[in-house]
């Protein structure tokens, strides 16, 4: 219904072009969690000192990388790096749902491309290694993105599943 709502809102505002947006949603239902993603906002999992990008950017550049037509390095500089191949409200909206096993103390990082355009995975890992609180991590990453140019909206959400006392 989210896709239809964005399409309807775009039509109601009489826009010449269509409105579109990305979505990355994390939901925990112990002992699993679910990731729903459309677009190029990302989900990273940080556990045992390892950062893993679980989501896949739904961009034309990433499609070309997947097809072996373009390297990852070239994709970052490509004119297609920010051209979405799937988005809510666009002609094509292909949500990807991933089911993963929950793990106590793993850190979940959801972010828009406004962060990942300006902050490398290596820098994300450095910040996660030194993390003392989710709030502080978000503030540091936001500042890193702004210092790197801050050319897009920047959204950062960090969470961790922690057992109750006695579990």
Enumerate the language-model features and the residues they cover.
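PP2C/PPM-type serine/threonine phosphatase catalytic domain
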Residues: 1-167
